[in-house]
């Protein structure tokens, strides 16, 4: 329950509950995988006092989950997500592909495999999986809206360079994340002109929410291959849209 709820308190309660499950059965592959997933989420949101220690713990639980049952699709799904966040891109695709082969109609693995493919390998194939995930399970477990599904499709169409569809899916999102907002702004600039971006409603709506964003870090955490144009184009665009203005104080 707690691992699909948002917030630091739920994150820590989820870890506590999963620890109890592991104490009961050390070979519980799903519990090890879910603990790794929970730690990965908390790490990304800055919940921990010693984040590196927690990430090492998460990686250890990924290893234990695979040793316990590599034929559990959830184990493969979570292993794929962790591998991609560690920039182990080929390993991420392998885990997602295996998870999909085990259970090809589960929306959780469809979302993971689709996300993996659009960012790293085969955009068209990935989009098929993302659309199927939306049709099978419009509001994912623990969510109140379809925002995460729309988010995945907006980024997927950015990866396809279908900028109109990136914008149209992005406009459906109620709770916008910084990375998706950036891909939508980039798409607006390609559909029109970069000088028109700040006139668009979606820019005005979220401008204040993301004015303190570290864009280099945000793009890094989207987990594209660093040499890929999907990554470098966003870096160049963010530098033009949000230049780092350094104020040099005059000395007497």
PLM segments and residue spans:
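Acidic, proline/glycine-rich low-complexity intrinsically disordered segments
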Residues: 1-109, 113-130, 136, 164-166, ...
């Amino acid at each position: 329950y707690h691992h699909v709820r948002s917030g630091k308190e739920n994150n820590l309660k989820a870890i506590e509950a999963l620890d109890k499950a592991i104490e009961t059965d050390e070979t519980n592959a799903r519990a090890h995988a879910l603990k790794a997933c929970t730690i990965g989420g908390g790490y990304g949101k800055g919940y921990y006092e010693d984040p590196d220690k927690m990430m090492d713990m998460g990686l250890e639980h990924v290893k234990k989950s695979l040793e316990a049952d590599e034929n559990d699709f959830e184990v493969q799904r979570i292993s794929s997500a962790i591998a991609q966040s560690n920039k182990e891109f080929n390993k991420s695709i392998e885990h997602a592909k295996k998870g999909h082969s085990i259970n090809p109609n589960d929306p959780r693995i469809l979302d993971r495999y689709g996300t993996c493919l659009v960012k790293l390998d085969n955009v068209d194939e990935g989009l098929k999986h993302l659309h199927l995930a939306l049709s099978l399970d419009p509001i994912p477990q623990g969510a109140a809206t379809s925002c995460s599904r729309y988010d995945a499709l907006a980024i997927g169409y950015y990866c396809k360079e279908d900028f109109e569809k990136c914008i149209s899916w992005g406009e459906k999102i109620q709770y916008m994340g910084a990375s998706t907002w950036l891909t939508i702004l980039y798409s607006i600039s390609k559909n029109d002109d970069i000088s028109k971006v700040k006139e668009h409603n979606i820019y005005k709506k979220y401008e204040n929410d993301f004015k303190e964003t570290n864009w280099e870090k945000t793009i890094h955490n989207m987990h594209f291959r660093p040499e890929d144009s999907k990554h470098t184009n966003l870096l160049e665009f963010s530098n033009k849209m949000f230049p780092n203005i350094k104020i040099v104080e005059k000395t007497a």
